């Protein structure tokens, strides 16, 4: 927009008085053009990294939030009048992420989680589904890094929860469509979930954002009472979770991918979910798992599924090869198109191989070569859907005394995977208790509170495992599959060699090669020596980073609770300064570079 000098001057003048925003019709991204950051960008480039590459004059338009002002005639691109009302009277906490802060790159993190929408449009949508008046009280119910939930309450006692995704939640349209379909499928299977009243995958609706309107989860969050619950009631919760897994594992699914309602996807990119007639409204489509769409990956034409695993026999794992290969080929395509090595004098530069796109591509191609051999070892390729993030906050129960599960929430990002990849402990009990969690000795009895808590955690996990062996033996066996460690590591690391660490992926691949007979690839002694050096350097960095995070009490990206932000920010600056004093020895230039390198510095 604004490709001529005259039109740009006109726009800048009007921006001082109007609520204008730029809108990319392709990516469904919205950004206020009157923000100071954008006014400084003469080209009006969208500053959100997720949408920057969608910016082309032919696909952008400017929408006026003030309806009676015509667009500048000098603009040659498409213009239209927005139906999104001004947000000046709405609480800014509705649109902004307020549940946490970041001690580095906070501006970008907050911008990625800002949701622009029409409050009145959302209330109107809620009124339609409930058949009541539009006079709702609206409060922010909660938010995570990828969603925001609001409670809309009517004076008649009716209420509804509205769930809106952020720009980093996943692919536009598909993420909401898949979440709704998965929730509806869970209800059909008898797994307690909130009822979906209505939804929109279209950000150009009257709400101005994708949304899901659903009933409020019944009961209380398990998180609020778990610490006070005794073994018996904890065991009751675990038994119910294992029984729900049984219902999921009983489905005979036809392939891999994410779940959709047929009405939300064209037939050309779907597979039937199952041969079961009762599931005929559902289908499998592209995976909405975030790594397939992160950064510029959504710009690449790649195979994201669905993938059918039954061309010959399930046990042959023919299409398990394809799902593993697709992720590796995705990274090859992304590296070829977008990976840019840092200059030799850049302090951020890592090892030579890490900064060499060809080294990544060569190693990924080696991995693709051994995928058929890897899948020969896999005993459980059957398509499986399990909850991806079963923590205490996602489970609701009637009460502490009646721990009957009333709702399981947050099915966003769910996908059907081979059982060998899908098998996981519920995150609420995912404690590390050794290589063999079934036969590990219990920690000794002690009066130490921390040790007692560890003992209780081990007992809960062992109880879940015992019930799983009893009711879901294939799931239990998948945890003990000999190749599982290699399969999971290669599956994970093959999707992030450039943004993660090539040495970690190479290490996983070497370990697998060493256990194989007649492997088609090999690593020379010289390659292994260089790898050992790079792996040691990488492991040292991991130790330092983990130690730093532990000292500051932050996440990997620097997230911290709002009440701790000032204290942690000050501690971070002091650590950075003290470390620079110790290492730089008065060298001002190196000190400046070192402080820029510091893990929790703005980039």
Residues covered by each model-derived region:
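Intrinsically disordered, low-complexity basic segments at termini and long loops, enriched
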Residues: 1-59
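Short amphipathic alpha-helical segments that mediate assembly, nucleic-acid/protein binding
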Residues: 8, 14, 58, 234, ...
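ATP-binding pocket architecture of kinase catalytic cores
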Residues: 137-358, 377-385, 403-404
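Long, low-complexity, polar/charged, intrinsically disordered or flexibly structured peripheral segments
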Residues: 294-376, 520, 545, 552-562, ...
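Acidic surface patches and DE-rich sequence motifs
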Residues: 4, 154, 398
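Active-site acidic catalytic loop and adjacent metal/ATP-binding pocket
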Residues: 149, 162, 366-421, 599
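Conserved NTP-binding catalytic cores of kinases and kinase-like/nucleotidyltransferase enzymes
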Residues: 35, 44-223, 227-231, 239, ...
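Active-site Asp-x-Gly
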Residues: 385, 398-514, 518-521, 543
